[in-house]
Swiss-Prot record:
GO terms for biological process: poly(A)+ mRNA export from nucleus; post-transcriptional tethering of RNA polymerase II gene DNA at nuclear periphery; transcription elongation by RNA polymerase II. This is PCI domain-containing protein 2. It holds the Pfam family PCI. InterPro entries: Csn12-like, PCI_dom, WH-like_DNA-bd_sf. One of its GO terms (cellular component) is transcription export complex 2. It comes from the Eukaryota. Signal peptide: none annotated. Belongs to the CSN12 family. The lineage of its organism: Eukaryota, Metazoa, Chordata, Craniata, Vertebrata.
Length: 399
């Protein structure tokens, strides 16, 4: 394949189209396939050759693909993205014309994946040259992916196995990757709704479902819907292929903070296994209600947590640390009427800076409001009066 002529290549394409062999055709238009390294296919003007062998719109599609190969070989990713856009647009013409059949879905997967990758590379190239903003090309790519999504979603006439709706989840996952990259998470909402209401929801491949759950779980975490985040991220982690250590680690980066906010602390064994020891001191601090250690741990690994986009989520663990510290005070004093001074002493012991009795009242009022403490503040007696039954409810019942 690395040394075939342009005519041999186009003949293979024509045979794949004639036999409706979507997988073979997808290979012949994929940048993961070795043909893209073949210098004999890097033509400046391949249109005439393509028109001699292929029918429209495939002639236009594969001419654009060959121009894209040429641009990519010259590391001109802006030009490559332009031609990859043409590839997808030409493909859509034929895809829409294929009524009640979906053999071309593998082609769509291949070319839309490459479109997103080229858009990302083009973005970086333009930003480096000072000619564009981060995400400009990805945003345009998302619009083209949405055109593909609409074609798939509107296929209501085909039989279940022949439906183009099988392509919806792949496209949604590609769009999620773009929206997370350009920080436009609100655009995920209608896509999530479309998949949740689809009767294909449980039929998609496990790999696609894992990716979907991972992104929806992350979005739920940013929306502070921690129970949904735990459910979706746990599904992704449990069903991710056991050999995919890297992917499992990536899921854990978001699952761990969610679990901790719900009161489930990770074991050191788990953190060591997935090389996530950055969480070890955070876990210890929250479990002990040690605010001093928590602040130090967050500061020490700040760069890692910010890069992963979880620093602000981990900051929410401070309120859990207050809850755990104040629970220790309650267990120590063994009374349901607790002097506010006792909490002030505990906070000063933890070196919480410039804390006074007013701030203690404010922290406790917040904990009561959030459901972390069952009780009330008696301002007259300067005491916290807690419930005799379960005054510090389990975190999983609160968040």
């Amino acid at each position: 394949m690395a040394h075939i002529t342009i005519n041999q290549y186009l003949q293979q394409v024509q045979e794949a189209i004639d036999s409706k062999d979507g997988f073979n055709c997808a290979d012949l238009v994929s940048f993961k396939h070795p043909h893209v390294a073949n210098a004999r296919l890097q033509l400046l003007s391949p249109e005439e050759k393509c028109q001699q062998v292929l029918e429209p719109p495939y002639d236009e599609m594969f001419a654009a693909h060959l121009r894209c190969i040429n641009a990519a070989s010259n590391h001109d990713f802006v030009e490559a993205y332009k031609y990859q856009t043409l590839v997808v647009q030409s493909f859509l013409k034929s895809f829409q014309a294929h009524k009640e059949e979906n053999w071309a879905l593998p082609i769509m997967y291949s070319i839309t994946l490459d479109l997103r990758i080229f858009a990302n590379n083009a973005d970086q190239q333009l930003v480096k040259k000072g000619k564009g903003k981060v995400g400009d090309m990805l945003e345009k790519a998302a619009e083209i992916l949405m055109s593909c999504f609409r074609v798939c979603a509107s296929d209501t006439r085909a039989a279940f196995e022949d439906s183009k709706k099988w392509g919806m989840l792949f496209l949604v996952n590609q769009l999620f990757k773009i929206y997370f990259k350009i920080s436009k998470l609100h655009l995920c909402k209608p896509l999530i709704r479309a998949i949740d209401s689809s009767n294909f929801k449980e039929e998609y491949t496990m790999a696609q479902r894992v990716t979907f759950k991972y992104y929806v779980g992350r979005k739920s975490m940013f929306d502070s819907d921690f129970k949904k985040a735990e459910e979706y991220l746990s599904f992704a982690f449990e069903h991710c292929h056991r050999s995919s250590q890297k992917n499992k680690r990536m899921i854990l980066i978001y699952l761990l903070p969610v679990k901790m906010l719900l009161g489930h602390m990770p074991t050191i064994h788990l953190l060591k296994k997935y090389d996530l020891m950055q969480f070890a001191e955070v876990t210890k601090a929250v479990s002990e209600g040690n605010l001093l250690l928590l602040t130090e741990a967050l500061t020490k690994h700040e760069t890692f947590f910010i890069r992963c986009g979880i620093f602000l989520i981990l900051e929410k663990l401070k309120i859990i640390s207050y809850r755990n510290l104040f629970k220790k005070v309650y267990l120590l004093l063994k009374t349901h009427q607790l002097s506010l001074d006792a909490f002030l002493v505990a906070l000063k012991f933890m070196e919480v800076g410039d804390v006074d009795i007013d701030e203690v009242q404010c922290i406790i009022a917040n904990l009561i409001y959030m459901g972390h403490i069952k009780g009330y503040i008696s301002h007259q007696h300067q005491k916290l009066v807690v419930s005799k039954q379960n005054p510090f409810p389990p975190l999983s019942t609160v968040c």
